[in-house]
Amino acid sequence: DWSSDVCSSDLVAGVITGDMGRSATGEPRAGFQAGYELRARYTIFAEGCRGSLGKQLMAFYRLDEKSDPQHYGIGLKEVWTVDPAQHEEGLVLHTLGWPLGFGTEGGGFLYHAADRQIYLGFIVSLGYQNPHLDPFEEFQRWKQHPRIRRYLEGGERVGYGARAVNKGGLQSLPRLVFPGGLL
């Protein structure tokens, strides 16, 4: 939480953490731990592309008043180690559309890094209309395309992840600094 307790004269001076260990009625339970106040000359809020504190700060300081609306997507990423014969360090592939249907924005990337590593991923706009669309399954289909599959065959996936991503472009970025902090 950030509030008037740590935001005086429009200057953020830290954060206040929430209490932990309260019951549904608000009563302290065993192991209750009270929140604490963390003061700072400058506070960095790094909670991802659509964090709750970030939304509050953008509204309070009107950080997005000169920005276009932001667009979001779900990004899925994997790291593979592949056979040296299938590796072309420095190769970059970008794709658009397929296997997504008409009207669904998205695409993929495949980067050949050092040490036989390939970073690949697929991003689907969160504005898709098909309620049956599964971004993870679309990523799996994308990896079966002959142009992608040939680099992965016989390789081993060594890492993976997913997260929400901003995809509105530079014109959609809010101002990132405000008195006492930054997003």
Segment roles from a protein language model:
Residues D1-S8:
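Short, small-residue-biased leader/transition segments that mark boundaries at the very start
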Residues L11-V15, L91-L93:
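Short, hydrophobic/aromatic-rich segments at coil-to-beta transitions
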Residues G21, A40-S52, L126, H145-P146:
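Glycine-/small-residue-rich beta->alpha transition segments that form the dinucleotide
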Residues T25-G26, S52-K55, Y119-G121, Q129-H132:
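Short helix/loop capping segments that flank catalytic or ligand/cofactor-binding pockets
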Residues T25-Y42, F178-G181:
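Core beta-strand elements of the Rossmann-like FAD/NAD(P) dinucleotide-binding domain
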Residues R50, A59-L91:
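Central beta-strand plus flanking loop segment that forms part of the substrate or channel wall
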Residues T95-G127, R175-V177:
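Active-site substrate-recognition segment that forms the wall
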Residues T104, N130-P131, P135-L183:
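FAD/FMN-dependent oxidoreductases across multiple families
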